[in-house]
A protein has these predicted regions:
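His/Glu-rich zincin catalytic helix
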Residues: 1-80, 185-287, 326, 330, ...
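Charge-rich, well-structured scaffold segments of protease-associated domains
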Residues: 1-3, 22, 77-225, 231, ...
């Protein structure tokens, strides 16, 4: 009978460092040259997330409307030129940052760069396009707000940070009625500037490609007035139930306010979260799905922002088993606080985390994503090896100690949206 080979965690990981260039306006450009890939991916990361907006929805509207017409190109022309050359662009926005990413074949980078220049530097935000966008998003949000999952997610953010905190605030769909071109243009002018931007490029970054990227980046204007974002204190609530008549399922969010990625306990807490609910065979999945059949899926994860972070557990269960599901989640947390994780389980989790790191870093795009995350946290790519080493050194005793320290029931926030009648 063949034996399974022993599980081993890599002792180190070699990730290329990004080469740093500085545009004439001071914006940093981080280049990861992988000439064997005949593609170029270019990301502009602006400190222009929702915490920086002065009016509801202007941060997301600004990012999403960059390609809806420029000084020289209509939205249709932008889309057609990208499509013709097999290029694409993607928009992502979170509480802190907006990420504008373009990807093209190396041989078609120049015509793609023409579009990039228009989208990043010369958007027009026409009133007509804004009205169409606002109406569509208002309807989408109204539909989303009927779902218990959306209700629980938004209420959980408010419970963790406070209803008026930029990380917790949620606007009603009616706020889209006040969205206007003037406010979007104002947000763009304040936040899409040289001081608020970093650029990360990966793939076949030849001298010619780099020169073109620098020429575009150099045109970003300087910030007219320096801004310091001052975040208010957190106001945490611990137990919230939201009645949603007719709901067949309850959406559960549980967790607590913690810390950013730079905290010394962040990586071992990632290991703890993985054990608890971070993969298909995790404790919460085994209990609530496999043993009790309460849900199709449940997960836990460490969520991080620039200035804060939290642990989140999320699932949806039938309304009739809501209380039983909450009891089982509490039971698994209590077990982590009182019993040691077996060496076999801990080794499995460590290997899965190491394997996921290897998978993400297999190619220039994944390396670019990790590089971006490291830059925003103040690290370079040597931090990846440090994280892997920290995962390897995490012990069962440390997991139990962290659970006792951070998963005290009195500190946990629980939000449930469903029909309790």
């Amino acid at each position: 009978m063949k034996q399974q080979p022993p599980l081993t965690i890599p002792t180190t990981i070699d990730v290329p460092q990004a080469k740093i260039h500085t545009a004439p306006n001071g914006t940093k450009i981080y280049a990861i040259n992988c000439p064997e890939y005949e593609v170029v991916r270019l990301s502009f990361i602006f400190h222009a997330g929702s915490i920086t907006q002065r009016h509801p929805f202007t941060a997301s509207a600004t990012a999403n409307m960059l390609a809806e017409g420029s000084e020289r190109m209509t939205s249709q022309q932008i889309a057609e030129q990208l499509d013709y050359y097999g290029s694409y662009f993607d928009i992502n926005i979170d509480r802190d940052y907006s990420y504008i990413t373009f990807c093209s074949l190396s041989k078609f980078f120049e015509p793609t760069a023409e579009v990039i220049e228009q989208v990043i530097l010369h958007p027009t935000f026409s009133e007509n396009e804004v009205a169409i966008y606002a109406d569509k998003r208002r309807q989408q949000l109204a539909i989303e707000r009927r779902k218990v999952e959306t209700i629980a997610r938004e209420q959980f953010a408010q419970a963790i940070f406070g209803k008026e905190h930029p990380y917790g605030i949620c606007y009603t769909e009616n706020a889209y009625e006040s969205l206007c071109s003037e406010n979007i243009a104002e947000h763009y002018k304040r936040r899409y500037t040289a001081e608020n931007c970093i650029v990360v490029c990966s793939g076949s970054i030849t001298d010619k490609v780099l020169e073109r990227i620098i020429s575009i980046t150099a045109q970003l204007p300087h910030t007219a007035i320096s801004e310091t974002l001052e975040l208010p204190p957190y106001h945490t609530q611990h137990d919230i139930r939201i009645q949603h008549d007719g709901a067949l399922q309850s959406s559960i969010r549980m967790g607590r306010l913690l810390f950013t990625r730079t905290h010394e306990d962040f990586v071992p807490m990632q290991v703890l979260s993985m054990v608890l609910g971070g993969y298909f065979g995790s404790r919460l999945m085994q209990n609530l799905r496999e043993q009790n059949g309460f849900t199709y899926g449940i997960f836990s994860a460490m969520v991080n922002f620039q200035n804060s972070g939290y642990l989140a557990i999320a699932t949806q269960v039938g309304t009739e088993v809501t209380e039983a599901a909450l009891e089982q989640i509490a039971l698994e947390i209590d077990t982590l606080r009182n019993e040691l994780v077996s060496e076999q389980e801990l080794l499995l989790v460590k290997n899965m985390m190491a394997g996921e790191m290897m998978r993400i870093l297999d190619g220039p795009f994944g390396i670019a994503d990790v590089t971006t995350e490291n830059i925003l946290c103040g690290f370079d790519n040597s931090h990846i090896a440090d994280n892997l080493d920290r995962i390897r050194r995490t012990t069962a005793e440390e997991i139990r100690s962290l659970a006792q320290k951070y998963l005290d029931p009195k500190d946990m926030v629980t939000v449930v949206a469903g029909d309790f009648s």
